[in-house]
Amino acid sequence: MPEMIRILCEGLATVLLALICTRFLCKNMKKRDFRFVPWLPYVLTGCGSAMLFLLGGLSPWTFCGIAFLFVLLYASVQDHSTHEADDILSVMMLMLAVTNISEATALSQLLGAAIVGGAQMLIALCGKKRMGIGGADIKLSTTAALLLGFYKGVIGFMLGLLIAVVAQLIITHRKKEQRTQPFALLPYLSVGFIIGYLI
């Protein structure tokens, strides 16, 4: 019984810390006039941190996942609002990836970054601008794949692209018009990468 109470207290403390950090994140996003639903970041970080704690307990993996979630959340909201993402977000993602590199995973992580980054560079160079892949998408996705490694990074990237295609088809069908403007890709890729982190 005391063990259960300890685990429950640790879980609640983890979620509470995530929600406090979310408050500061939301204040910053509001100050920069980003468009977002005010309660949604709290739901996402609260549920996300709870799920990470349930899967990993009080561990470096859990806290790395929460930091990963915060970077992706901020990048997604900024991309949705301005079609840009600050360079510092890629640097933060790179720092998370570097802290995760070990001798056993280095090759997988570098391969994941090379494949995801290379695939996006090809799409950006060969495709049309309206496909939605820009420099911020490439930098953040490449560093996310470096953090996740080959298997999880590629799966996360492919899932994110699939979600983006399906969502844009639904949006285009509902509006009954051909979409010519680029759309924010990072929110979709973020969902894929979070799923990749959890598997």
Regions found by a protein language model. Name each.
Residues 1-199:
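A membrane-topology feature that recognizes alpha-helical transmembrane segments
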